[in-house]
Amino acid sequence: MKEIDEVLKKVKRVHFIGIGGSGMCPLVEILHSKGYEITGSDNNESDTLNRVRALGIPVTLGQRAENIEGAEMIVYTAALLPDNPELCAAKASGIPTFERKEMLGAITRMFDDCICVCGTHGKTTTTSMLTQIFIQAGEDPSAVIGGKLPLTGTNGLVGKSEYMLCEACEFVDTFLSLSPDVCVLLNIDEDHLDYFKTLDNLIASFTKFASMTRKEVIYNGDDANTLRAIAGAKDKKFITFGLKEGNDFRADKIVLEHEFASFDIIKYGENVGRISLGIPGEHNVYNALAAIAAADNAGIPMDKIIACAEAFHGAGRRFEILKRINGITIADDYAHHPRELEATLTTAMGMGFNRVWAVFQPFIYSRTAMLFDDFCRVLSIPDKTVLTEIMGSRERNTYNIYTSQLAEKIPGSVWFNTFEEVADYVVKNVEKGDLVITLGCGDIYKAAKLMIKKLEKQG
């Protein structure tokens, strides 16, 4: 038994530093439902804080040493600085302190059936679709998702069953703190190389995660890197999905339409039904197959799986249509890696719009530098490309990489320092019938909102 599990058995009062973080809120809700007394603090007001307060949980704005008074355990976000006054006070007082990923791991062990969805791309969409299937099929799951599920309007769920559906992120090996009963492995691609350094190291982490899984490992049988990872995992029940012959769950007679995708579901060689997805693109065919295989493995009847999956129309910030105004469609997507951008932009280009505008915010210097050529290639797919400054986040620009260098290599692209400039340029030049899609895992969605405001003023 891990230290955090022992502590949770002994305590009742848990204090969250950074309780307003979107990744913290589902953990707070689940612990609260299990009878723990929760308190928390944050530096900024947010919708998430209001959601926490609605549960009757006291929240302090601002972080001070006295906020931890009475706490028997501290949970903090990975982004917290080591000199945070509450964290320092807790350590000085001998109060057990744990990072968010450790608490998420402990929560996965509170359930008999924890299904963890991992992979470089598609985690949020797949976890969201799977959660919707479980909810609408009457399974009453708990869930921790990396984005908002439109059905519930939240990124977490507290259910009464023993099912826990959890998005499992590989960054800094976060997922190795979890305890999966079932692993759903979507794909593996070069990412987070600032941490993993090499693709081999990244694959090795996924091998560890698959090996930790207690029951079934459901994986993409078409993905070469995934096959390498799975080769190192022994003594598991394996279930494959993909488009190629030989996969246990396969899509056949695929039709990719304007905003939809449909295909026949082939389960162990038998056609078990046709599904029409409310989300576009071949990449979402893979995501749907993964969710279908996981739901089927849990014993949900196929007719229910199909009906529930068809009712799913995407997760927040995953090709999310924000507004159709003056004949112009404004959308937003979380894509920030070349493979994700390629999937999203290729899908967008096939949807019949007059022109497709990609408004991209590069995220972190290391990724931009290491995958520079790939970014230049995929950002040449749309008709128009608009770039913002690189969002450095946790990094300093030791790579001497700048947006202007990307723009030089992408034909016809432009770049701007501010979202205001981006919005002004797009609104001035966009035409009826165009799709404008903001792309990135930072705050580029703010540029989309600015565009909408400016278009509304035009009338």
Predicted ranges, named:
Residues 41-42, 60-63, 98-105, 144-146, ...:
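Beta-strand->loop->alpha-helix junctions that form or flank phosphate-binding loops
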